[in-house]
């Protein structure tokens, strides 16, 4: 229902019936008569954005629950533990170094940065002592470290236009999300959910 509502609302209001007919035409090959412009807006833009947003929401909720369960601390999340900051650093490094600015290369860079940040936080926590409190404090320190590295990379390595694009990307925006993004996000989210539920 939320996906359908997200596809119906926007600058151009589209009835829910049109959203349902468009989805049925695209998914099941139904032959409902739908205005071509409305169908293009719904399928190519709004439903794709709504699906990516849903995948992101599920992934964030799942990662938060897993971290809170592992650390037995309600404060634990990817932002406080520095994982999100490390992912940002990895993606920015990939973009700046010209290793590819495509969806897969940015995602792999972000994943590598997140793993590196997690390793750094684990080392800091081990040095600080055992306990969930030490992990949280190490995560905050790691988050600040990787945020500083990201800012340094952007300031030293990018021209003004590139820096603007990177900062816009870091702030997060789903306006450019399309179906290839869904095909990348959905399997990862489903696999992660299955693994977490199985454990």
What are these model-predicted stretches?
Residues 1-199:
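Alpha-helical transmembrane segments in inner-membrane proteins
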């Amino acid at each position: 229902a939320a996906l359908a509502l997200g596809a119906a609302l926007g600058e151009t209001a589209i009835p829910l019936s049109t959203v349902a007919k468009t989805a049925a035409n695209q998914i099941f090959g139904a032959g409902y008569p739908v205005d071509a412009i409305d169908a293009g807006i719904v399928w190519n833009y709004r439903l794709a954005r709504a699906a990516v947003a849903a995948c992101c929401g599920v992934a964030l909720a799942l990662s938060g629950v897993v971290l809170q369960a592992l650390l037995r601390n309600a404060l634990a999340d990817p932002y406080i533990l520095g994982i999100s900051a490390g992912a940002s650093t990895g993606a920015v490094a990939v973009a700046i170094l010209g290793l590819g600015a495509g969806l897969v290369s940015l995602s792999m860079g972000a994943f590598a940065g997140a793993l590196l940040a997690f390793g750094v936080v684990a080392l800091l926590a081990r040095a600080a002592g055992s306990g969930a409190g030490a992990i949280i404090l190490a995560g905050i320190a790691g988050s600040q470290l990787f945020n500083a590295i990201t800012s340094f990379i952007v300031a030293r390595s990018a021209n003004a236009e590139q820096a603007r694009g990177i900062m816009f990307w870091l702030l997060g925006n789903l306006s450019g999300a399309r179906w290839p993004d869904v095909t990348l996000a959905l399997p990862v989210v489903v696999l992660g959910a299955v693994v977490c539920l199985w454990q």
